[in-house]
Each structure stands twice: as structure tokens, then as C-alpha cells.
A protein has these predicted regions:
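A short coil-to-beta-strand element that immediately follows conserved catalytic motifs
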Residues: 63-72
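Nudix hydrolase/Nudix homology domain
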Residues: 34-36, 99-130
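Acidic, metal-coordinating catalytic segment for phosphate/diphosphate chemistry
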Residues: 1-14
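A structural signal for short, well-ordered beta-strand segments
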Residues: 13-15, 70, 86-88
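Conserved Nudix-box catalytic region and its N-terminal flanking loop in Nudix hydrolases
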Residues: 19-59
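Residue-level preference for beta-strand/loop junctions
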Residues: 9, 34, 80-82
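Active-site-adjacent beta-strand/loop module that shapes the phosphate/pyrophosphate-binding cleft
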Residues: 74-95, 105, 126-130
Length: 130
């Protein structure tokens, strides 16, 4: 029988979006020490991860994206986080800043701004494996 485990996990979803030149799309966050980062967010209770990333991206930019495929799903013991990363593409809309996101920009994978190491690693891993 399956044992229920009560450990609380947080789940986060992220979108990796590359343009024709192989540059990666980053958001400039208004509330972070490292301002630049990949588009990401949390799940609402009972929400499916694929719906969550579409909702988050739309809420933060006013733009519609679609999922091309799941790139990664992994859990981390350290911070009890389950990360689900999708390869996505922009379908429609034009960028409107929100209170969380002030700017959106494509960067060369080898010339990324100051950002979290884990996100840099993820971007480089994805770029090498696409």
C-alpha cells in the first residue's frame, strides 16, 4: 500500500523560452536581490503544473505562451521544492509590465546577467540538450 507522507512540499513551475538565435528569455524582477531570472511561479492549490506556468506568464506579462515539452521535473530535499520546467514558446500578446516584472529580455546563454547559479546551470544544461 502507498504510504501517505505528510512532508509539505512546495511546487514551482518555470518556463524556458529560446528565440531563433538560441538566446534565453529572462524577466527582470522588482523584488529580488538578483533581479534577472527565468519566468517561474508557484502552483495554486489543486492547480495542474502545465496550467500554472501559462497562468503565471500571462499574469506577469499579459502574453500567452504554449508548452512545447516538459524539460525537467525534480525534487530537492534541501528546500523541499519540486521544480517543474517546461520548454515553451510565446504565442501572442505584447509585453506589459506588472508589479513583479519590470522588463523582459533575451540574453546569450554565454553572457547571462547576475542571477541564481541554479538558474544559470539549468539554462546552460537546456541549451546544450535542445
Amino acid at each position: 500500500a502507498m504510504r501517505m507522507f505528510r512532508a509539505k512540499f512546495r511546487a514551482s513551475v518555470a518556463a524556458l523560452i529560446f528565440n531563433e538565435q538560441g538566446q534565453v528569455l529572462l524577466f527582470k524582477h522588482t523584488y529580488r536581490k538578483f533581479e534577472w531570472g527565468i519566468p517561474a511561479g508557484g502552483l495554486e492549490y489543486g492547480e495542474q503544473p502545465d496550467k500554472a506556468i501559462l497562468r503565471e506568464f500571462f499574469e506577469e506579462t499579459g502574453m500567452q505562451i504554449e508548452i512545447e515539452r516538459l524539460l525537467l521535473a525534480e525534487s530537492s530535499k534541501e528546500d523541499r521544492n519540486i521544480s517543474i520546467v517546461y520548454l515553451c514558446r510565446i504565442v501572442s500578446g505584447s509585453f506589459q509590465e506588472s508589479n513583479e516584472i519590470s522588463e523582459m529580455k533575451y540574453f546569450d546563454v554565454n553572457d547571462l546577467p547576475r542571477m541564481l547559479f541554479a538558474e544559470k546551470d539549468l539554462i546552460r544544461w537546456a541549451a546544450d540538450n535542445l
